[in-house]
Amino acid sequence: MPNTDVSSLSMLGHQTETASSPEEAVLEKVPSNHAGTDYVVRFTAPEFTSLCPMTGQPDFAHIVIDYIPGEWLVESKSLKLFLHSFRNHGAFHEDCSIYIAKRIVELLDPKWLRIGAYWYPRGGIPIDVFWQTGKPPEGVWLPEQGVATYRGRG
């Protein structure tokens, strides 16, 4: 099994402050040791938090990010801190969701990526945001995201 050189990473293995905004947050990548193999990497953030840009009240989401790597993998600690940087950031649900996906695409240039952002109700209406870069490669096992549609007490 090949070793991955992590010497260029600034966060992994170090105490790291959370960035004050998503724009300031650093996302890092590591080389994929399986660049010629199509497989799915999934990150799930069941307690994602941001702020409503109008009221400043917290918004919560269950976010699922699936991607098929090319040459690079996202370093998970940097992703965790990037997602955490939204905690005090005011933005609409759609903006947060698409910004997260596009930052990862910009960093990695993956073969394929999708995001499912399942936002808890605001004003009595849950907002779910879905985006992907295109069709996934054929023959890849792509599990459902497994997040139930919001039902409330119904």
UniProtKB/Swiss-Prot annotation:
Location in or out of the cell: Cytoplasm
UniProt keyword terms in alphabetical order: Cytoplasm, NADP, Oxidoreductase, Queuosine biosynthesis
Full protein name: NADPH-dependent 7-cyano-7-deazaguanine reductase
Pfam families assigned: QueF (PF14489)
Lineage: Bacteria, Pseudomonadati, Pseudomonadota, Alphaproteobacteria, Hyphomicrobiales
Keyword Oxidoreductase in annotation: yes
Compositionally biased tracts (Polar residues): 1-21
Purpose of the protein: Catalyzes the NADPH-dependent reduction of 7-cyano-7-deazaguanine (preQ0) to 7-aminomethyl-7-deazaguanine (preQ1).
Residues the entry annotates as binding substrate: V74, E75, S76, H93, E94
Similarity comment: Belongs to the GTP cyclohydrolase I family. QueF type 1 subfamily.
Known catalytic reactions: 7-aminomethyl-7-carbaguanine + 2 NADP(+) = 7-cyano-7-deazaguanine + 2 NADPH + 3 H(+)
InterPro entries attached to this UniProt entry: GTP-CH-I_C/QueF, NADPH_dep_7-cyano-7-deazaG_red, QueF, QueF_type1
Classification via HAMAP family: QueF_type1 (MF_00818)
NCBIfam families, per the entry: QueF-II (TIGR03139)
Annotated EC: 1.7.1.13
Organism: Rhizobium etli (strain ATCC 51251 / DSM 11541 / JCM 21823 / NBRC 15573 / CFN 42)
GO terms, molecular function: preQ1 synthase activity
Annotated segments matching region Disordered: 1-26
Annotated pathway: tRNA modification; tRNA-queuosine biosynthesis
Gene Ontology, cellular component aspect: cytoplasm
